[in-house]
């Protein structure tokens, strides 16, 4: 019995039609692991940073018609919310699991906060080749850093400073059948390895 990881059938919760039915499926197949991961990694980030981190599992409470196409747990050193701060995420779309760290468009002082990626641009470029960037957390599409030129990366970072909807996240993904999801041990190891890379950008 696994506690933290996700099986291929768990991703199928996003194929369930209708808001209520999909929420029921997410609550049964996905949220238990998000809650466990929330407990585990809020402690992990607290120990790694010396700040008290809190987990925020998506509730999708504002939805009244359209079922969610993704769900997540986010981590930030604020009990009341995470969107205003640079934050970490573990989440799922129907075809992949994602890990992310960065600045959301709702972020407070986001033009300043995103400069950490300018400051550590060489570190960003040297991340392993399966690392990605997401420029819109609401869309599943992500680009591999290795496929982007320095100019494209700089423009993506600058967009956060100049465009209201601008966002920048460094990311890493798994497909539902990847070996890293086969056991809790393998999955937790993958997540820690990834977050340790992301922590290089946390200040």
From Swiss-Prot:
Q: Which residues form the signal peptide?
A: none
Q: Which Pfam families match?
A: DUF1054 (PF06335)
Q: What InterPro entries does this protein map onto?
A: UPF0637, UPF0637_domain_sf
The family assignment reads: Belongs to the UPF0637 family.
- Name under which the protein is recorded: UPF0637 protein SH1846
Q: Which organism is it from?
A: Staphylococcus haemolyticus (strain JCSC1435)
């Amino acid at each position: 019995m696994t506690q933290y990881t996700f099986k291929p059938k768990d991703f199928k919760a996003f194929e369930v039609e209708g808001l209520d039915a999909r929420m029921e499926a997410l609550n049964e197949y996905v949220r238990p692991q998000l809650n466990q991961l929330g407990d585990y990694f809020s402690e992990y980030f607290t120990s790694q940073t010396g700040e008290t981190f809190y987990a925020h599992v998506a509730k999708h409470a504002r939805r009244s018609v359209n079922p969610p196409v993704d769900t997540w747990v986010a981590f930030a050193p604020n009990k009341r919310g995470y969107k205003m701060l640079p934050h970490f995420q573990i989440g799922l779309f129907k075809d992949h699991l994602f890990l992310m760290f960065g600045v959301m468009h709702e972020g407070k002082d986001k033009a300043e906060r995103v400069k950490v990626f300018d400051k550590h641009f060489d570190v960003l470029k040297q991340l392993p080749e399966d690392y990605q960037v997401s420029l819109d957390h609401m869309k599943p599409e992500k680009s591999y850093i290795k496929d982007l030129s320095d100019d494209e990366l700089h423009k993506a970072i600058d967009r956060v400073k100049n465009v209201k909807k601008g966002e920048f996240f460094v990311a890493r993904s798994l497909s539902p059948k990847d070996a890293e999801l086969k056991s809790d041990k393998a999955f937790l190891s993958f997540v820690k390895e990834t977050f340790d890379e992301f922590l290089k950008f946390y200040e």
